[in-house]
Regions:
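Alpha/beta enzyme core
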Residues: 81-112, 116-202
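Glycine-rich, positively charged N-terminal anion/phosphate-binding segment
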Residues: 1-3, 18-94
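Active-site mouth loops of central-metabolism enzymes
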Residues: 11-21, 67-80, 116-117, 143-156
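Active-site beta-loop-alpha junctions enriched in small/polar residues
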Residues: 18-20, 43-45, 73-75, 101-103, ...
Length: 372
């Protein structure tokens, strides 16, 4: 049984925070299919401390959502500590994850995200600051990171041990380097090596979990204690039902035909509209429609119109034009979401690699907005 601080998590599955995706409606939809730990969108510590209303609005959980899980991004140990203190003292969440895995150039270029673990003292200071504020309130802190900056600057083993010594409740590893972004294949062997190095807290594996069988294979291959699912559930919230069945040893659910997929997509739209209002809610659905319909014979015109859908009524009309008896297509399986190609190099501040022991705070890497 995966244990995150005081919270048992079964099945041992965590929904990775994804900007613009893992809001309260999407988490509710996923939870209708299966249990697990569902993390809300990433929130920046600077914006939270500054009282940014958008950030506070993102930290909304349904009454039956427990534990309430949030991921924070920050580069300054002082600000991170202030943000964590705010969260725990105001009882805004039950679990806090720290983001050290973001590979986006606008973040790493200024010394944030997946660039931070290279600076061991800075990384340790941030983690300890969060743990020190959260522990008295019984709120577990976890970290999510990557293998390293690139193959010449591997950081995950040192970072894992540092985080463990600092008192985190678990360590999650996306088994890619920052330079890979989401391209290529995740190196699951690194998850196994991290599991051998970090012995007192759970180790979670992330990267290329696109089917329930992938999760079982990763855990068997690496010995990790649980899996983190990101892109694999985009347009496929029923993946959590498949994961629950696999971990419970039950037969896999029947893959949904297009009629069932359309019902889930409409349910998602209703939840978004209820949360955000008719206009914004339906706009938020647009990016999901391509994920839901991947592999189905829909037709370019209807697919395009769904990507610009403006109301629930129009959504119903467009769904009515589909051949809803289509079985679930094999083409819908496998990698989904952003993939791209590896960068030629990781954008970093000038001289960033010169001194891995520097604890200097890269203040320019602070993000003022409420999401990543």
């Amino acid at each position: 049984m995966l244990q995150i601080g005081p919270y048992p998590v079964w099945p041992p599955v965590v929904l990775a925070p994804m900007a613009g995706v893992t809001n309260a409606p999407f988490r509710s939809l996923c939870r209708e299919f299966g249990a697990g730990l569902y993390v809300c969108e990433m929130i920046t510590t600077r914006a939270l401390v500054a009282g940014d209303p958008k950030s506070r609005a993102m930290m909304r959980f349904e009454p039956d959502e427990h534990p309430r899980s949030v991921q924070l991004y920050g580069v300054d140990p002082v600000v991170v500590g202030q943000a964590v203190r705010l969260v725990v003292e105001q009882d805004l969440a039950d679990h806090i994850d720290l983001n050290f895995g973001c590979p986006v150039p606008k973040v790493t270029r200024k010394g944030g995200g997946s660039a931070i673990p290279y600076k061991r003292r800075l990384f340790e200071s941030i983690v300890r600051s969060a743990v020190d504020q959260a522990t008295p309130h019984g709120v577990p802190v976890t970290v999510k990171m990557r293998i390293g900056i690139d193959s010449d600057h591997i950081t995950y083993l040192d970072a894992g041990r540092i985080a463990e010594d600092a008192g985190v409740a678990a360590v999650a590893l996306h088994a890619r380097t920052a330079i890979q972004h989401y391209s290529g294949q995740a190196d699951w062997e690194t998850i196994g090596r991290l599991k051998q190095a970090v012995t007192s807290v759970p180790v979670l594996g992330n990267g290329d979990i696109f089917a329930a069988s992938d999760a079982l294979t990763m855990m068997a291959m690496t010995g990790c204690d649980g899996v983190v699912v990101g892109r694999g559930c985009q347009g496929r919230p029923w993946l959590f039902a498949e994961l629950a069945a696999a971990f419970d040893g039950r037969p896999a659910p029947t893959p949904p035909d297009l009629r069932a997929v359309a019902e889930v997509m409409r349910r998602h739209a209703v939840l978004l509209v209820a949360e955000m209002g008719a206009d914004r809610g339906i706009r938020e659905l647009r990016k999901h429609t391509a994920w839901y319909l991947r592999g189905f014979a829909v037709g370019s015109q209807v697919r395009r119109e769904l990507g610009m859908v403006a109301s629930l009524t129009e959504l119903d009309e467009l769904i009515g034009q589909l051949d809803l008896d289509q079985p679930y297509p094999q083409a819908a399986e496998g990698p989904r979401g952003r993939q791209g190609t590896p960068q030629r190099r990781v954008a970093l501040p000038h001289g960033w690699l010169d001194d891995p022991e520097s604890a200097a705070v890269p203040h320019e890497a602070e993000l003022d907005d409420g999401g990543g």
